Regions:
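Active-site environment of divalent metal-dependent phosphoester hydrolases
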Residues: 65-66, 118-123, 144-146, 223-226, ...
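Active-site neighborhood of phospho(di)ester-bond hydrolases with catalytic His/Asp-centered motifs
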Residues: 59-62, 110-118, 137-140, 216-221, ...
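Active-site HxH/HxHxD metal-binding segment of metal-dependent hydrolases
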Residues: 44, 67-68, 76-81, 87-94, ...
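C-terminal regulatory/interaction regions
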Residues: 2-4, 14, 305-394
Length: 394
């Protein structure tokens, strides 16, 4: 492999603040700058990527530190580690500025921001960058509602609370209205205007920004508008893929739509000449096909376990907090939307193929039970659904 890696600044004790540079065979460089985001109860530090292709491009922006602490810890009634509590409110911004300076740039040099998707840890620091640089923002049209709406975070609270209650999860202490007011105060000014909506695959070409070095591939499933960016010219025998949250290592992503996600993983496994996949969290993936096969097997096993756990009527939260369902212990007394949603999407895919069904509602909480048939028969129907791209689930 001709691709070269160089650590310029190592990560700190919270595994952020690091800068690493990847050099392609033709000498062009991709710089990874890692910014703070909580792990275990959050996705972990967020990698931002810097590409100099005639215009300086930043892929994803990270999240303001004070907001990351609230979203992933305080607003979930969780205890905050002293090391995290002591971080300055603009810690992630300082990490970005230090990372840019290490390779000869500053925030004002950024001309284009490309968002891999519309989740909070990927765009909420955008306005901080835009105010200093005047950068334009590009994102897939299918995630613009999440990114552009000043009330998107508040809306997720009002939509999420009844859903998580129906799963059987304990809700945070505050009322929806209390959270709404605080969230509006913190986030309503952080929505972004999408100057350059992406609507098709192929070489980056949006409103005057053109690049044969950056190829866009729509990769839905983690979110409707998730994209991957393949970095490298046609003559490059080895290419880098910036995959956002579609493919992570060693953790596994939390899909928004499991059926769509499994179709995307199939597609990514067919790509050629990808030497390394650089995700937005965690470690690089050096074996693209191997990782996609692992992810397919991982979700098959989780579907199987979900199916077996629902032999008797179970709530979504009972399944999610079952020991062994995740690699980490999920405390059933805690509020954990990511864990609840992960179990929910597996139940919903099983429900689509009639492997499980909703059998009762007790005090607003839904219970599911499996069909009693061998799981292999159920999974065969799931595989048929994945393979038949002509089927859209309403």
């Amino acid at each position: 492999m001709q691709l070269k890696e160089k650590v310029i600044i190592p990560n700190d004790k919270l595994m952020s603040g690091g800068v690493k540079q990847y050099t392609l065979s033709n000498g062009r460089k991709i710089t990874q700058i890692t910014t703070f985001c909580p792990d275990i109860i959050g996705p972990g530090p967020t990698h931002l990527y810097l590409i100099d292709d005639g215009f300086l491009t930043l892929v994803d922006t990270g999240i303001p530190t004070h907001l990351a602490k609230k979203l992933f810890i305080s607003w979930r009634d969780l205890e905050m580690a002293a090391m995290v509590d002591q971080l300055p409110h603009n810690h992630s911004q300082l990490e970005l500025e230090r990372g840019l300076a290490a390779v000869g740039y500053s925030i004002k040099d950024i001309e284009l921001i490309i968002l891999t998707h519309g989740h909070l840890d990927h765009f909420l620091m955008g306005n901080t960058i835009i105010e200093k640089s005047g950068a334009k923002v590009a994102a897939h049209v299918r995630d613009t509602e999440r990114i552009c709406n000043p009330w998107a975070v508040s809306r997720s609270v009002f939509e999420g609370r009844p859903r998580y209650k129906a799963m059987g999860m304990r809700l945070p202490m505050g009322t929806a209205e209390e959270y709404h007011q605080e969230i509006l105060h913190e986030t309503s000014s952080l929505s972004l205007k999408i100057d350059l909506p992406i609507s098709r695959d192929g070489e980056l070409s949006v409103n005057g920004y053109q690049s044969s070095f950056i190829t866009v591939k729509h990769s839905p499933g983690h979110s409707p508008g998730s994209i991957s960016l393949i970095i490298g010219d046609k003559e490059d025998q080895e290419k880098i893929m910036l995959c956002g949250d579609v493919m992570l290592y060693p953790i596994t992503p939390h899909p928004d739509d499991l059926l769509t996600y499994l179709r995307t993983i199939d597609d990514l496994g067919q790509l050629k000449d990808i030497s390394i996949c650089l995700p937005a969290h965690g470690e690089p993936v050096y074996d693209l096909l191997g990782r996609t096969e692992f992810l397919k097997e991982h979700h098959r096993n989780r579907l199987d376990y979900t199916y077996r756990l629902s032999k008797e009527p179970k709530t979504v939260w009972e399944i999610a907090s079952e020991p062994g369902y995740f690699d980490i212990v999920i405390d059933p007394e805690n509020y954990n939307p990511m864990a609840g949603h992960e179990a929910y999407i597996h139940i919903k895919l099983l429900e689509i193929v009639k492997g499980v069904s909703q059998v009762k509602i007790d005090k607003g909480v839904y219970f599911y039970q499996n069909s009693g048939e061998p799981f292999d028969q159920v999974y065969s129907r799931i595989c048929q659904l994945i393979d038949d791209r002509g089927i859209t689930i309403l």
